């Protein structure tokens, strides 16, 4: 075997359907916004009820997926984590950067439901996912608390969530434009401060695509105010 050219093939078993049509605004890690729900729709070869037998006994799942919008021809051994302001380089294997030799992501999500009888076969609903709509999924595995939870673990340069949650102000007339079942998720996403960590201009207006809407907002101090909500073009 030639280790210089060794490769492997993986199969896309499913795609996720989420409220994010672009990368901006997606929580930086899974589980930060539990109100976010997404659906896992299997590709035709894997639309098997039998493949999900026993899954209902678990509360959380691991998703193994592809950073499909972050492909690069060449990889770099160091990257600039946004958490550090984009100015400091760390080894790619010491980060969760999408720009990796293999653009593979790993997310822990809550199992919110299983519908075995849909026109597209069995569909899994999950909560707390940090994936863009259409992201390819390579595998699904159950989360095992006794093996996967390590209270003694160290978090390196990211021992805790970045910064405090923002207070979110959505004027009533704008909130009325958001479907009722999406309001708590939108508030949760905005409270995480979707801005790049190096941008703090209180006059700047940011736009985020969410659930078919274009949500524009400003941030001043620890307060985020939504200034417009329109249908996504």
Model regions: which residues?
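Mixed-charge, low-complexity intrinsically disordered regions
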Residues: 1-104, 116-125, 129-233
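Conserved positions in beta-strands of structured domains
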Residues: 17, 109-112
